[in-house]
Amino acid sequence: MSPARATAQRSLFPSMEITELEFVQIVVIVVVMMVMVVMITCLLSHYKLSARSFISRHSQARRRDDGLSSEGCLWPSESTVSGGMPEPQVYAPPRPTDRLAVPPFIQRSRFQPTYPYLQHEIALPPTISLSDGEEPPPYQGPCTLQLRDPEQQLELNRESVRAPPNRTIFDSDLIDSTMLGGPCPPSSNSGISATCYSSGGRMEGPPPTYSEVIGHYPGSSFQHQQSNGPSSLLEGTRLHHSHIAPLENKEKEKQKGHPL
């Protein structure tokens, strides 16, 4: 091997190493650039999609508000219908500045504190304790609600709450009132029929039957009165004689004791 060839080979090896190193560096730079481009495109697409969704949501809300505000203007008026040709509705597309505008409720809610950080108290209605109806009429207790004046409440209690009657009205009182033809005074016989008493005050005869009481009761029907007509007449005459007989006896005794 000649010394010239040896020197040539020695000079080739460093040059090949240099070219290989340069090629590797170029490949690494290209790969890094591609990765960066992919990452940038992904980030841009993500932000673009989020911005587009936000803009579409805002435009839908704005369109809904505009539709609600101009709902009466979508239909032609009576004058245009009577004229024959309705006026065309002009649609103006939203401007790009309106699309990017932030709605006011978001601006308000951004600076408002949340519930745990509220400084003012919540205005709740006052607690009212109502009565359950078990207390006496003045309602002495925790009840703090007064719907009426005290005088008016006392008057209502006085008018609505009354004592029971002093006597009990029996069927015999009704029979006496119907036979005598008028109202009778309060009965002192404690519910015993007038036919059961004689002039001496002792009981004579049985009490009136159910048919007699129903026949002489003022609320009975006309047919029942017709069917029990003779019996009612007999009862009337018997009651009349039982009331008149003591009076006649007293008059006779007076005549005997005081002759003319």
From Swiss-Prot:
GO CC aspect terms: early endosome membrane; endosome membrane; Golgi membrane
Family membership noted in the UniProt record: Belongs to the PMEPA1 family.
PANTHER family xrefs: LOW DENSITY LIPOPROTEIN RECEPTOR CLASS A DOMAIN-CONTAINING 4A, PROTEIN TMEPAI
Keyword Transcription regulation on entry: no
Motif SMAD interaction motif (SIM) location, chain numbering: 164-167
Transmembrane helix is among the record's keywords: yes
Biased composition (Basic and acidic residues): 248-260
Motif PPxY motif 1 location, chain numbering: 136-139
TM region(s), chain numbering: 21-43
Species of origin: Mus musculus
Lumenal side of membrane: 1-20
Domain of life where this protein originates: Eukaryota
SS bonds (residue pairs): none
GO BP terms, alphabetized: negative regulation of SMAD protein signal transduction; negative regulation of transforming growth factor beta receptor signaling pathway
Residue ranges, compositional bias (Polar residues): 220-231
Bilayer topology: Single-pass membrane protein
Official protein name in the record: Protein TMEPAI
SUBUNIT field: Interacts with AR. Interacts with LDLRAD4. Interacts (via the SMAD interaction motif) with SMAD2 and SMAD3. Interacts with NEDD4 (via PPxY motifs).
